[in-house]
Regions:
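A contiguous strand-loop segment
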Residues: 2-121, 142-155, 159-171
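N-terminal leader/propeptide and maturation segments of large enzyme subunits in energy/redox metabolism
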Residues: 120-136, 142
Length: 171
């Protein structure tokens, strides 16, 4: 299980919004500081899960943005067959924060998940938001568009909190 907490700027004594989280993943964690980058037009990134994941799927290639934002992220090495390194949260240069939240899905929802799923996994979505979003609302639009176009690879129960200094969204 993991947890996330957002406190809006109108509820703090100093006017700052807060996003916090905890996860009990059984692997090593580390912080990475990723500089802003320019990428060649047409560059692709690999997203998804492998056939060896607890809920199998396949890796696909999707377009990388031509510019990605500077960000700090929390990465870890393993969870249920999702390819490492795995990102479960962070903060970018525009003040967009991401926190991955996991809770176990109901059995019937897991059974409904396609056995050869495609699309970005929860980690891919967190990383892409850190690279591309300029607001929490922008993060929701980016993730919605990616899932609509490519699908989503799940291992049964992930959501995200996308936050900035003005608002937060749970998706």
């Amino acid at each position: 299980m993991s947890y996330g907490l957002y406190i809006g700027k109108n509820l703090t004594s100093n006017g700052h919004a807060w996003l916090a989280g905890y996860g009990d993943e059984p692997s090593s964690h580390w912080l990475e500081i990723i500089p802003k980058k320019k990428h060649k037009t047409g560059k692709k990134i690999i997203v998804g899960v492998t056939k060896n994941a607890d809920m199998p799927g396949k890796l696909i290639k999707i377009p990388q943005a031509t510019k990605t934002h500077k960000h700090i992220r929390v990465s870890y090495s393993y969870y249920l067959g999702v390819p490492a390194p795995i990102t479960n949260g962070g903060l970018n240069e525009y003040g967009v924060a991401v926190r991955d939240i996991w809770s176990k899905s109901r059995k019937e929802l897991i059974e409904m998940t396609p056995k050869n799923q495609t699309g970005p996994n929860y980690s891919d979505l967190a990383r892409i938001v850190l690279e591309r979003a300029k607001s929490a609302r922008d993060a929701v639009t980016i993730v919605s568009n990616l899932i609509k176009k490519y699908g989503e690879s799940t291992y049964g129960g992930n959501s995200h909190i996308f936050a900035d200094s003005n608002e937060a969204w749970v998706m």
